Each structure stands twice: as C-alpha cells, then as structure tokens.
Amino acid sequence: VNSPSTAISLESVSKRYGSRNIIHDLTFSVRKGEIVGFLGPNGAGKTTTMRMIAGFTTATSGRVFVAGYDMATQNEEAARHLGYLPEQPPLYDVLEVAAYLRFVAKVKGIAAHAVAGELDRVIQACRLEAVVTREIYKLSKGYRQRVGLAQSLLGDPDVLLLDEPTAGLDPGQIQETREVIRLFGENHAVLLSTHILPEVTLICQRVAIINDGRLLAIDSPEGLQRASEQSNRVSLLVAGPEYAVRDAIVAIDGVISVDVRPAADGSEVLSVDCHVDARAGIEAAIAKAVASRWSLHRLERQQPTLENIFLRYVGVPPDPRSAA
C-alpha cells in the first residue's frame, strides 16, 4: 500500500481501548492529488482513525504512514507534512484571528520570512479578510470553522485531514469551502470525513465506508454504484389490472420482488417498482411481458444513489422512493 505516490497509508491497523476493539485491521491508502470521502455512522471509528493518522493516538497494531513516514517511529517528520481539522477546531478564543494563525505558523515551524505570505494565502482561501482583527470568541460558528480550516492549510501540507469541515456553515460558505478543498486536493492528499453525502459526490474521487471499525468498501462513487447494480430497481408505469401485472412481472427470470401501487395522479395507471438482479436484458424482458398485453407508459432502470449504497453497507434498509 505504501509507495512514493501514496500520501496516507494504513496497513492492518487496529485500535483497542481496554478490552474493546474500536478499529479492526484497517487497510487503505490515499494518493497525492486525491480526495477520499470517509463515511460511516456515528461511532463507526472515523474520528479514531483520523486521530491515529494525525499521531494524536497510537495504533494498537499495524502501521500508519504519512508522506512516507512511519507515524510510530517518525512522528515529527510525518507531522510536518500534515494539516488536521478536528471536528472541534483547536482555537484560542482570546486571540485575534491573525494572532492565532501566526501562533500556529510558529508551532508548525514556518520560516519567519514566509509567515506573512502564508497568512495572506489561507486568509484569502478561507474568506477571513473581514474578521482578521476580531477575537475568536466573538466569531460565529461558521467563521470559527473557517479559522480552523485556515490553520490546517498553513504550511501547504502534503496531507489534509478534515473531520466535518463544513459543520455549521451556511449554504454559501459550504460552497466556498468545498471549492477550497477541491483546489487543494488537485495536488495534495485529502481525507474528508462528512455526513453530507452530496459533498462526497461533488468533490471526492473515492469513497471509503466504515462501520464498527471495519472498512466495508472503498471505490469511486461510480464504482460503488456499479457494484450495487446487482440489487437494482426497475420502475414502470403501466395501464392494466394490478394482480395480473404483478403476476406477469414476478414470473420473469431475474425479478426478485415487485411492488405495485396506484399512480400518484389518481389515474388507472399503475406505478410498478421491481427489485431485479444484474443480468443483462432484464428491462427488455419486463417491457416485452407488459407491452404485449397492456399499455406501457414508461420504463426506466433506477441507479442507486450514494445514500442508498451507504445505508445498505451500514445495515439500514434504504427507502426505495429515494432511488432515482
């Protein structure tokens, strides 16, 4: 997993607190120039994993590499290549924004002659110009989050760990922050933990899904979608008798189940939702069986959304109405 192009690498990483196993044999990597969305329900182990990558807690077993450095034996070297925004940003409320960022720059070892330029860069990137002389305790939650993001960007680190970076932001700020992350991810490695699934679809090249401390899947959103097509759905509108339509479709090879209900507009047209397997030609077989006896108004194969895929992996039955 660990190679010159790999910026983050976890190799068989486990974490135990007392007798409790929190993380189980986790192996995955993030390459330079890649944004990976890190998804999982609350308590899945996302924050613990990020804290191990950041060096804030150690793995019980396995190895963590950041920019090629072993976090267990080369912690200081690894930390120089790392920017981290925890879910609760590490802010000093009594400091002004600019003073806080100067302090972080000093802690990160940024050369004195480069500090002013670095502050200008992150202040502009995070749209903090209006609050640079304001004490942090006077800032809104959205601005506090942006200050936290700014400190993680200081020093232009190779690796960026972001734990819920858009929490507390309004829609406009979310869009701006998303663009900052997207641009940063073009030449750096970003691991992004979020509950906002559209955010993952918009800016992440790959998605890692974790639950109960175990990695369940890691692939591109499109790859996860293709893998989920073995339990896909076909929907159609047909004018015909309910039970006869149901029986005709259920008899087709590849149809797992059928849900028939009156159309929402109150007409005699039936809305039919078919749970099908991945075999080729299933839509054509359904269309032929229906159109030969009744009037077929519409037929389409529904692609699973990232939300559907996520819910299936973590064991929550998805709402069939949300697939589109």
Placement of each model-derived feature along the sequence:
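ABC transporter nucleotide-binding domain
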Residues: R178-C274
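A short linear hydrophobic-aromatic micro-motif
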Residues: R127, V255-R261, S295-E300
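Conserved beta-strand edge residues that scaffold enzyme active sites
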Residues: L119, Y137, A263, Q303-P304
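ABC transporter nucleotide-binding domains
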Residues: S5-L10, K15-N211, L215-A217
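Solvent-exposed beta-strand sheet faces enriched in polar/charged residues
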Residues: E11, L237, R261, E300-Q302
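C-terminal coupling/interaction segments
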Residues: N2-P4, C274-A324
